[in-house]
Amino acid sequence: MSTLPTQIAPNSSTSMAPTFLLVGMPGLSGAPSWWTLPLIAVYLLSALGNGTILWIIALQPALHRPMHFFLFLLSVSDIGLVTALMPTLLGIALAGAHTVPASACLLQMVFIHVFSVMESSVLLAMSIDRALAICRPLHYPALLTNGVISKISLAISFRCLGLHLPLPFLLAYMPYCLPQVLTHSYCLHPDVARLACPEAWGAAYSLFVVLSAMGLDPLLIFFSYGLIGKVLQGVESREDRWKAGQTCAAHLSAVLLFYIPMILLALINHPELPITQHTHTLLSYVHFLLPPLINPILYSVKMKEIRKRILNRLQPRKVGGAQ
């Protein structure tokens, strides 16, 4: 059974210990059977749903367009994110393994944040795509060429990897003033960084990384939707407004699904608020696990091209010359 790391004496610091203790949802490790199957089901359904989206887009040349390319990247980020979460989640559920080596913890942290920021970046790119398609329909093909999309993809890759690869090295050499006990069932950067001493110089860079992605992206996304709303107000035909709005429905739902739990987590993450650890941890699970599960359903239902091709693939093919 895992034990708490040794307490650090007041006014003293130490280097990173060889292990971290993951607390997660209190009480779950004592009765893992009832939440192991839902965890496995969430992972398998997320992988199946996003894998289907990847398969359909890759095999259909008609879907090799900007919006579908960004949807392809979104499914990649969803599969990567849910896969990065599973090792420690299933370790706690199946074996009560709350202790994780520091190196494995930092590696998991990098993958979680790389794919999380990738998802945020792709959602931003998709909002720009929708804004251009609705606000500048005549110029849309000339604005979002294959070359521009390639540059956007490179920018997303640099943003995800360039910003987050230095984090484990910074955290590994920062002085720590608190025991290495993490509040979640997986390793997150804010959870690790809060254990460092206040004067640690890497904290400023860590704050910059968080704000540059998760703080900036939702503002730009909602600015894009402000432009879309302004254009739609000038459309006289109610039917045309409805059609234009429907092209944004799946994306806007995905945006709200991703950012609302994250914003709530930021708002309740204050020691003076009477929020239980169960509530905080459950909201974290919703933020990380629900989008990969729901996004494929949203896009399959709301996007006619995706839905039609999935149904065509599922229908049995007629044999011979049967009509």
Swiss-Prot record:
Extracellular topological intervals: 1-33, 84-107, 169-203, 266-280
Entry annotated with the keyword Lyase: no
Cellular localization per UniProt: Cell membrane
KW Protein biosynthesis (keyword) present: no
Chief location bin: membrane
Residue ranges that the UniProt entry lists as topological domain Cytoplasmic: 55-62, 129-147, 225-244, 302-323
Transmembrane segments: 34-54, 63-83, 108-128, 148-168, 204-224, 245-265, 281-301
Superkingdom in the source lineage: Eukaryota
MF-aspect GO terms: G protein-coupled receptor activity; olfactory receptor activity
Positions of disulphide bridges: 105-197
Bilayer topology annotation: Multi-pass membrane protein
Keywords, alphabetical: Cell membrane, Disulfide bond, G-protein coupled receptor, Glycoprotein, Membrane, Olfaction, Receptor, Sensory transduction, Transducer, Transmembrane, Transmembrane helix
GO cellular component: plasma membrane
Glycosylated position list: 11
Pfam families, alphabetized: 7tm_4
Family note: Belongs to the G-protein coupled receptor 1 family.
Function: Odorant receptor.
Protein name: Olfactory receptor 51S1
Organism whose genome encodes this protein: Homo sapiens
